[in-house]
Amino acid sequence: MSWQAYVDDHLMCDIEGHEDHRLTAAAIVGHDGSVWAQSATFPQFKPEEMNGIMTDFNEPGHLAPTGLHLGGTKYMVIQGEAGAVIRGKKGSGGITIKKTGQALVFGIYEEPVTPGQCNMVVEGLGDYLLEQGL
């Protein structure tokens, strides 16, 4: 399966039990900041934004004082899982980022999608990729 198929079929799909509820944007990005696959709606990000995200995975709490920035959008960092998941909130939407051995899985959402639904979709694919050694 191509990386784009993972984004299209596993991240940008209807959320289980909620037809027409799906993430706003999604991507799979290598630890080096190279985009493996992304939805058409995923924001263009700056290298320093990706560096900040990677630093937070290695030094949990790094982004808390400044917020998480992606594509010029600032998210307030909320409870995640140190070294494994970063979660952010902005207004009625937010972001979930799951770290795997080689990549970061991104999901961005707006209402009516809930934070829990975004977490389920992003972390589900991330856990699967970890099981595959990726």
UniProtKB/Swiss-Prot annotation:
InterPro entries: PFN, PFN_euk, PFN_sf, Profilin_CS. This is Profilin-4. GO terms for molecular function: actin monomer binding. PROSITE patterns: PROFILIN. It comes from the Eukaryota. GO terms for cellular component: cell cortex; cytoskeleton. A motif (Involved in PIP2 interaction) lies at residues 84-100. Disulfide bonds join 13-118.
